[in-house]
A protein has these predicted regions:
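Generic detection of intrinsically disordered/low-complexity segments and helix-coil linkers/edges
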Residues: 2, 24, 114, 148-151, ...
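Alpha-helical scaffold segments that mediate packing/assembly in large oligomeric complexes
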Residues: 4-91, 205-206
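Helix N-cap / beta->alpha transition motif
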Residues: 26, 30-32, 101-105, 156, ...
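Extended oligomerization regions of viral-like shell subunits
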Residues: 63-188
């Protein structure tokens, strides 16, 4: 069983108030007109906000957590690159550290390790994965392996502070004059700060 998580499973989320660093996040979806549209859009907003808090906002001033972390540069994913990432994280943060990547990156890492994969990657009793004896958290919002991307993070995510600063009411518009199908929009406001720049490191593809 692979361990699927979201950024919010790893980072403490608290209530907050809007300030100069607050990120405005809007989620949109076409939905059937039903009583649970608000709940559906709240889930959609969480998914959208996870991508933006990690990757940044296109055309906006917020660069995302992946831009804030220190990085180790590599041209490809190898065992040596993973070892360099591991040792770059100061020892004080390793006790609670986890690896975070998407499932495609994990599969490519296993292929790159080849016959030595079982020396690097092991399974726990619940069949969740360990890499270098540290938990692997698979997150759909993490980017794929490509030049310039940071597809793997390693560190103590308790040092990331996320504040939920509220959301606007659900907005609904009919599609093509039909009351059965709606364009739903919900906007939320969040702050995301890496409290300690040494607590999380990333592997950057160059």
């Amino acid at each position: 069983m692979k361990k699927w998580i979201s950024l919010y499973d790893l980072c403490p989320v608290e209530s907050g108030t809007c300030n100069d660093g607050t990120v405005r996040i809007t989620a949109m979806a076409y939905l059937k007109n039903c009583p649970d549209n608000t709940q559906q859009m709240e889930k959609q907003l969480l998914r959208t906000s996870e991508y933006i808090l990690l990757r940044g906002k296109h055309g906006g001033g917020y660069g995302g957590l992946l831009r804030d972390v220190n990085v180790c540069a590599t041209s490809r994913i190898t065992g040596q690159a993973i070892a360099d990432l591991y040792t770059s994280l100061p020892k004080v943060y390793r006790q609670n550290a986890v690896f975070m990547m998407n499932a495609v990156t994990m599969n490519k890492l296993q292929c790159a390790l080849g016959v030595y994969a079982h020396d690097w990657i092991t399974s726990r009793r619940d069949r969740s994965l360990l890499l270098m004896n540290k938990p692997v958290m698979l997150c759909n919002a993490m980017p794929f392996i490509r030049k310039g991307s940071v597809p793997i993070l390693f560190g103590d995510f308790s040092k990331v502070s996320i504040k939920d600063c509220g959301r606007d009411e659900l907005q609904r518009e009919s599609c093509n004059g039909s009351s059965d199908r709606l364009l739903c929009t919900m906007t939320g406001y969040m702050n995301c700060v890496l409290e300690d720049s040494q607590a999380i490191w990333g592997l950057k593809i160059i």
